[in-house]
UniProtKB/Swiss-Prot annotation:
Protein name: Ribosomal RNA large subunit methyltransferase M
A single BP term in Gene Ontology: rRNA processing
Quaternary structure, from the entry: Monomer.
Keywords: Cytoplasm, Methyltransferase, rRNA processing, S-adenosyl-L-methionine, Transferase
Organism the protein comes from: Haemophilus influenzae (strain PittEE)
Enzyme Commission code: 2.1.1.186
Enzyme active site: 313
Length: 363
């Protein structure tokens, strides 16, 4: 068990490779990444046996920015017989189970990468899931409750119709979503599809049980670069009153809610109204990531907000390095003022050439 598989958006394999190598080295684990451009996944191979399992346990999944899923895998199973793919797959799982007790496993995902080529396998994967699940249950696996907070999910990752990896992820340190992708439905009354970015960010960064406490009708938000209102929509839907800052027009449907005030100003120059306590700042402006980072830092240091979600648009080259630089600079700015804070960042499914960052100031 010396291999990890990590899913990602196609085109971001090098960023995942750099990130997993960094995170592994912090734990004293070393290896190399197998990268195929635009494949939608990376295989990280550790130099020492059993270290992949350690990484899957000890690298906090929520600290990985570019990875959608992280799991320990077998070697590649090749030339599977179309008449009986299940037997060698079960055998591979049995080998993994010598090290990990799959009696605590609760779910099976038969998956592909998120590419057009791989998606051609999606119908096969869906049909194959039922007989494979039955075969694994005969081994005494997949019997744990889906709501448990420990144990594993089992994964069968097909790269071709006759080639797959089998593996597992830890329930307390993975994405619970199939292929690592949350399925969100576009609201018919939302002004733009960008609304899904903020919805996914809220679901990713804020625990469900805390959402009503941290986003509610007693709060005020500011949306910088708000037009036409995709992000404002998500705040208004949760009851917030929003100052929507943009020279462009906002959707009439948002004005009709009575929960927004349109401020036709430059997002970089806008300051919150005096005697108003702003709880949330959101920002999805197309600008250099370093400039956005400074803007967000200014809001937090001035006490203009307590919590923020914003996007950093990525450069064409050295994307991982630029992200780390921006996040480190923000952390230094806040730490120098003795602020207690939490930073999370993720390349969300609904992001493209950008990442989404969440910062919360703590008491």
């Amino acid at each position: 068990m010396n291999k990890l598989a990590l899913y990602c958006r196609p085109g971001f394999e090098k960023e995942v490779a750099a990130e997993i190598a960094d995170q592994a080295s912090h734990l004293g684990v070393f290896g190399f990444a197998r990268v195929q451009d635009n494949s939608g996944y990376v295989i990280f191979e550790c130099y020492q046996p059993d270290e992949a399992d350690r990484l899957a346990r000890d690298i906090p999944f929520n600290r990985l920015i570019f990875a959608r899923q992280m799991m320990v895998i077998s070697g590649l199973l090749e030339d599977l017989d179309p008449a009986d793919r299940i037997s060698p797959i079960v055998t591979a799982f049995e080998e993994l189970s010598q090290q990990v007790n799959f009696a605590q496993s609760s779910e099976l995902f038969v998956e592909t990468a998120d590419t057009n080529e791989a998606k051609e396998l999606s119908t096969f994967c869906r049909k194959f899931t039922v007989p494979l699940r039955q075969a694994l249950k005969k081994q005494g696996w997949l019997s744990a409750k889906a709501t448990q907070k420990s144990g594993q999910f089992l994964h069968c990752f097909f790269v071709k119709p006759n080639c797959c990896y089998v593996g597992y992820s830890y329930v307390d340190n993975h994405s619970p979503h199939f292929m690592g992708i949350p399925r969100l439905k576009f609201p018919a009354d939302a002004p733009s599809r960008s609304t899904l970015k903020l919805e996914e960010a809220i679901l990713t960064f804020i625990p469900r049980k805390e959402e009503n406490k941290r986003l509610n009708e007693n709060m005020i938000g500011v949306d910088l670069g708000a037009c036409p209102g995709g992000w404002t929509y998500q705040l208004v839907k949760r009851g917030l009153f929003v100052y929507a800052v943009d020279h462009g027009k906002m959707a009439a449907s948002l004005h009709d809610t009575g929960r927004i005030e349109h401020c036709a100003e430059d997002g970089f120059k806008f300051q919150p109204p005096k005697r108003k306590k702003v709880d949330w700042l959101v920002c999805d402006m197309v600008e250099q990531p370093s400039r956005i980072s400074l803007l967000i830092g200014k809001w937090l240091l001035n006490g203009w907000c307590r919590e923020t979600i914003f996007n950093l648009k990525l450069p064409m080259k050295k994307r991982y390095q630029e992200v780390i630089l921006c996040l480190e600079n923000l952390a230094v700015m806040l730490a120098e003022q003795n602020l207690n804070f939490e930073i999370q960042a993720k390349h969300l499914y609904h992001d493209r050439e950008e990442i989404t960052v969440h910062i919360a100031l703590k008491p």
